[in-house]
Design a protein with these regions (language model features):
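Amphipathic alpha-helical dimerization/coiled-coil segments
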Residues: 2, 78-108
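N-terminal helix-turn-helix DNA-binding core of bacterial DNA-binding proteins
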Residues: 2-43
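Short, charged/polar surface micro-motifs in flexible loops or helix N-caps
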Residues: 21-24, 51-52, 78-81
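Short, well-ordered turn and helix-capping elements at secondary-structure junctions
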Residues: 30, 59-61, 77
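Short, hydrophobic-biased segments on the C-terminal half of alpha helices
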Residues: 46-50
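Beta-hairpin "wing" of winged helix-turn-helix
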Residues: 52-66
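Exposed loop/turn and edge beta-strand positions of beta-sandwich/beta-sheet ligand-binding modules
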Residues: 69
């Protein structure tokens, strides 16, 4: 049975990073850099969010020679909807990939 509780601070951080470019497939190492989360925290979060249906996951179709294929992730339609609701509840503005997250100003 799945618990229905709000995402943790780490999950929210990951979701907000993914929401900057929701259609883009991202690999774990890239996400560790952008979120600041350690791999031991990030990969279980990715698995949990995928199990909830908030993320889509797939293996890289072709990997460069000398490197194994990466597991790629992106927000699902449900995940994007839930992330936007979470951002609104936390008064966070999701900016483009190049920008950082920032709290909304009162009256904005």
């Amino acid at each position: 049975m799945q618990r229905n509780r709000p995402p943790s601070k780490q999950s929210a951080s990951l979701l907000f990073v993914l929401a900057r470019d929701p259609g883009a497939w991202r690999h774990g190492y890239e996400l560790t850099i952008e979120t600041g989360l350690k791999a031991g925290t990030l990969y279980p979060l990715l698995a949990r969010l995928a199990d909830r249906g908030w993320l889509e996951a797939q293996w890289e179709a072709t990997a460069p020679q000398g490197r194994p294929p990466r597991h790629l992730y992106r927000l699902s339609t449900t995940g994007l909807k839930e992330t936007r609701a979470l951002a609104a509840a936390q008064k966070v503005t999701i900016l483009s990939r190049r920008a950082r997250l920032r709290p909304q100003r009162e009256g904005a």
